[in-house]
């Protein structure tokens, strides 16, 4: 019975009251059976007890209402302190409440309790009430008669007093002592369970958050590495659609995990505190939910009346960030060393992350400084080059050269004439501008982001600088010549003129040579074209004048000259070669041509009908299925080597194929003769038409004077 009662009271304190009522009723029935003479007196006592319990319940409800009001005030003060603590924690990039803020908050609440002694936490109030009840019970038991004891329902409130006429049986004393022992055990078990729950809740929260955050960071690292690999491979490979979809999905997963991360735990590179303000409400809500759960557990374990439960459920919206110690005056609970170790570990991780970020920023700044130094060095080198060029120009000015009234060095391009581009030498090679193994890169002076207006401004500035330099050079040039005597000036002028004449002569010679080369090339091209035209002209009349036998003959019917015979034979050979090449191209479109040395059968067949010479080819694989077919003419089963049409509908043997080819040649020649005859007939018809028209016109002109009224026929 004791174990069952303890289990019931741990879950629901209201069941404890029912259990006590049942025990009291059972004891009352036993008492009736043992002493029926005292029935009337005990019934009176029970009625009085019930009245007292009702009064005490009312008093308890009133006191609980007062306590709830006080708790509301205390909770409001706690909310203000909690909001300040949460803001401080967010600024420190920590989601959990640190130990210092808990201690400061606890001290502030203890000070409030000292100033207002009637205000106590709900758990402490309940414990103090129980202690007062036990003390008063002991005091009353000492004053009472040994046969008179209080009913078990009267132990709930200290203001309950015993009626002087109440008396109980001595057997009931033992039951009451057992019940008191059970209650004490239950209270101790409740306190132990509360301590365990309070220690387990923060321990469960931290590993879950740490594990989820570590998983997310691992996912982010994996996705970022994969995306980097894809990007590197994409620079020298073509991406298929599947790879592109994979890359898109990985990027989407990465951004999704980054969005779900806490910005306070993220490093600065990933946008650490950029979205901090948007997460303040989220952090406050999480803290409030955790505190509400703690308050619910405390209220459900500490209240013994239904009214108290209802009142405390109404107070769930009030937030208490401090977990109270069940022993009352010992102050707030001290977190376990495991939690302290985890907090220290997290703080160390944050410090390491901040140090890494600081180091990265320093490295970035150092790189920028190095780049700036390199740019300055390049600018200094360019300035040195310009100074060297100016010195060379000054040396040349000591031996001036005039061309058309202007000095020669004025014709040279200044180093600033390159408006848009400048040559920047890469680290390898020498500084000289010789065409060696040195590598140069042309860099644009103006950035692509500059508009056309900036581009024009740069051009104008360059032109102004050129004009200023020219003026300075002219002044220096005049000063040098003004210092020299007249004779030396004349000699210098003569030397310059001679040099200029020599240069002009050299240029003229070069131009003449180029013209000669162009003329030679032009003559060669003309000769080649003439030869081609002559060959084409010779081929045309020979094709027209060839008779049926194919022997060359002239239009007069005589044998041609020896010189012409050689030309005609060459032309015929060329025609045959052209036909063979055309046949090769047509055959390659159907089947690939192998080497002539391999799989050569030595058998003869024709591809086209009107060909002069047979062409030796390999046996085709397309005829392998027709080995047992009959010839279309002689109907003899032989290997078919001839075909009639391009589709290969009719197969022929070797003899019939030769006969078929000859017959086809005859047909082709007959068709050509018919065409020629038709052309001659058309010419004759045209001639006859012309004669008839002329004859008609002559008749019209002769009959014109007679028929003066109708000169034209109707």
UniProtKB/Swiss-Prot annotation:
A Gene Ontology BP annotation from the UniProt entry: regulation of transcription by RNA polymerase II
Ranges of compositional bias, category Basic and acidic residues: 667-693
Compositional bias (Basic residues): 148-168
Annotated protein name in UniProt: GATA zinc finger domain-containing protein 10
Positions of region (Disordered): 28-97, 115-180, 266-362, 394-419, 454-476, 528-621, 667-714
One Pfam entry name: GATA
Biased composition (Polar residues): 271-282, 550-569, 699-714
Cellular component GO terms held in the UniProt record: nucleus
An example Gene Ontology molecular-function term: transcription cis-regulatory region binding
UniProtKB keywords: Coiled coil, Metal-binding, Zinc, Zinc-finger
PROSITE patterns, alphabetized: GATA_ZN_FINGER_2 (PS50114)
GATA-type zinc finger span: 631-656
Coiled coil: 661-694
Record field: compositional bias (Low complexity): 30-94, 130-147, 169-180, 283-322, 340-362, 457-476, 528-549, 570-588
């Amino acid at each position: 019975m004791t174990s069952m009662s303890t289990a019931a009271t741990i879950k629901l304190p209201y069941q404890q009251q029912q259990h006590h009522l049942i025990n009291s009723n059972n004891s009352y029935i036993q008492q009736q059976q043992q002493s029926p003479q005292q029935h009337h007196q005990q019934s009176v006592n029970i009625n009085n007890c019930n009245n007292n319990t009702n009064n005490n319940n009312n008093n308890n409800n009133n006191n609980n209402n007062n306590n709830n009001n006080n708790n509301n005030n205390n909770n409001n003060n706690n909310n203000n302190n909690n909001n300040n603590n949460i803001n401080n924690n967010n600024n420190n990039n920590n989601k959990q409440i640190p130990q210092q803020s808990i201690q400061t908050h606890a001290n502030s609440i203890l000070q409030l309790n000292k100033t207002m002694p009637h205000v106590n936490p709900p758990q402490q109030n309940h414990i103090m009430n129980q202690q007062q009840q036990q003390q008063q019970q002991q005091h009353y038991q000492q004053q009472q008669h040994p046969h008179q004891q209080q009913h078990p329902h009267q132990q709930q409130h200290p203001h309950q007093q015993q009626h002087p006429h109440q008396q109980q049986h001595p057997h009931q004393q033992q039951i009451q002592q057992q019940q008191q022992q059970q209650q004490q055990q239950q209270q101790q078990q409740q306190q132990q369970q509360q301590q365990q729950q309070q220690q387990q809740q923060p321990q469960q929260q931290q590993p879950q958050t740490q594990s989820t955050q570590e998983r997310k960071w691992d996912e982010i690292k994996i996705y970022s590495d994969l995306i980097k690999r894809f990007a590197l491979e994409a620079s020298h490979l073509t991406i298929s659609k599947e790879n592109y979809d994979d890359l898109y999905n990985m990027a989407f997963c990465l951004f999704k995990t980054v969005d779900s991360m806490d910005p306070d735990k993220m490093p600065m590179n990933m946008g650490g505190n950029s979205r901090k303000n948007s997460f303040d409400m989220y952090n406050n809500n999480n803290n409030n939910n955790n505190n509400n759960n703690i308050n619910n557990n405390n209220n459900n374990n500490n209240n013994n009346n239904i009214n108290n439960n209802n009142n405390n459920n109404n107070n769930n919206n009030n937030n208490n960030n401090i977990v109270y110690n069940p022993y009352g005056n010992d102050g707030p609970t001290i977190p376990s060393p495991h939690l302290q170790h985890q907090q220290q570990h997290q703080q160390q991780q944050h410090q390491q992350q901040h140090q890494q970020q600081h180091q990265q920023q320093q490295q970035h700044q150092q790189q920028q400084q190095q780049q700036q130094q390199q740019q300055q060095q390049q600018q200094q080198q360019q300035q040195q080059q310009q100074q060297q060029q100016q010195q060379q120009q000054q040396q040349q000015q000591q031996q001036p050269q005039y061309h058309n009234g202007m000095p020669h060095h004025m014709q040279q391009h200044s180093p600033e004439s390159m408006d848009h581009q400048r040559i920047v030498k890469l680290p390898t090679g020498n500084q000289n501008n010789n065409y060696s193994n040195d590598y140069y890169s042309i860099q644009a002076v103006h950035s692509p982001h500059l508009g056309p207006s900036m581009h024009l401004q740069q051009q104008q500035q360059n032109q102004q600088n050129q004009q200023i330099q020219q003026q300075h050079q002219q002044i220096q040039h005049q000063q040098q010549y003004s210092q020299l005597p007249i004779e030396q000036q004349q000699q210098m002028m003569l030397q310059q003129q001679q040099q200029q004449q020599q240069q002009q002569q050299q240029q003229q010679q070069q131009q003449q040579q180029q013209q000669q080369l162009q003329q030679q090339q032009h003559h060669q091209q003309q000769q080649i074209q003439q030869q081609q035209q002559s060959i084409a002209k010779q081929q045309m009349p020979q094709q027209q004048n060839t008779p049926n036998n194919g022997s060359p003959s002239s239009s007069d019917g005589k044998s041609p000259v020896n010189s012409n015979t050689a030309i005609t034979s060459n032309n015929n050979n060329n025609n045959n070669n052209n036909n063979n090449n055309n046949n090769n191209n047509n055959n390659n479109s159907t089947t690939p041509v192998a080497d002539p040395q391999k799989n050569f059968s030595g058998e003869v067949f024709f591809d086209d009908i009107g060909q002069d010479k047979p062409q030796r080819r390999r046996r085709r694989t397309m005829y392998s299925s027709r080995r047992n077919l009959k010839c279309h003419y002689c109907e003899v089963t032989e290997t078919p080597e001839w075909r009639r049409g391009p589709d290969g509908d009719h197969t022929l043997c070797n003899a019939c194929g030769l006969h078929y080819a000859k017959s086809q040649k005859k047909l082709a020649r007959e068709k050509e003769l018919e065409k020629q005859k038709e052309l001659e007939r058309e010419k004759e018809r045209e001639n006859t038409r012309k004669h008839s028209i002329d004859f008609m016109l002559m008749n019209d002109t002769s009959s014109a004077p007679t028929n003066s009224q109708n000169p034209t026929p109707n």
